[in-house]
Amino acid sequence: MKVLAAGVVPLLLVLHWKHGAGTPLPITPVNATCATRHPCHSNLMNQIRNQLAHVNGSANALFILYYTAQGEPFPNNLDKLCGPNVTDFPPFHRNGTEKTRLVELYRIIAYLGASLGNITRDQKVLNPNALSLHSKLKATADILRGLLSNVLCRLCNKYHVAHVDVAYGPDTSGKDVFQKKKLGCQLLGKYKQVIAVVAQAF
């Protein structure tokens, strides 16, 4: 499902991710002006690189924390249960122009943010005592929100991009316990894989 994103998207995504819903955001008009809520920082690309380096550096630890918390059969069947087999994940082309890479990064962050919201919601029910996992998921989502805001600032101020089509992953609310755990593991495996490529591209 696709929606249009504009300057108000960071705030809407904060609300969207907080509740972990899998439903799309309201549609923003195509002719929306390119405006950000706050002035952009002068060292924006450095901030984007630092945020990418941070999430890249913590992605593997989050992945391990996740599959360990799920218990058997996950830790001993990572290739089968946690392989990054997510077919609708937004693509990224590391050799594209900066504008193209930023647009693709925006789509990836929006997808990941909604996915982390779903994973966090599920884990609070399935593994209520896995507090370190909950904390790590929240910290990652917080960094991604800041990254999304910075990417939007850069797109708006330098390239006058007023909207970006974004898509969200599957909502897990109707799935059984095992499928919720498996999909979360696959998404975090994909996240770990993709964020490493993205971080090197900037």
Curated annotation (Swiss-Prot):
Disulfide bonds: 34-156, 40-153, 82-185
GO cellular component: extracellular space
Residue positions with a glycan: 31, 56, 85, 95, 118
GO molecular function, one term: leukemia inhibitory factor receptor binding
Signal sequence extent: 1-22
Listed PROSITE patterns: LIF_OSM (PS00590)
Gene3D superfamilies linked: 1.20.1250.10
Domain of life: Eukaryota
Keywords of the record: Cytokine, Disulfide bond, Glycoprotein, Growth factor, Secreted, Signal
Main location class: secreted
Compartment list: Secreted
One example of a Gene Ontology biological process annotation: regulation of cell differentiation
Biological function: LIF has the capacity to induce terminal differentiation in leukemic cells. Its activities include the induction of hematopoietic differentiation in normal and myeloid leukemia cells, the induction of neuronal cell differentiation, and the stimulation of acute-phase protein synthesis in hepatocytes.
Stated family: Belongs to the LIF/OSM family.
Protein name according to UniProt: Leukemia inhibitory factor
Organism of provenance: Neovison vison (American mink)
Primary gene name: LIF
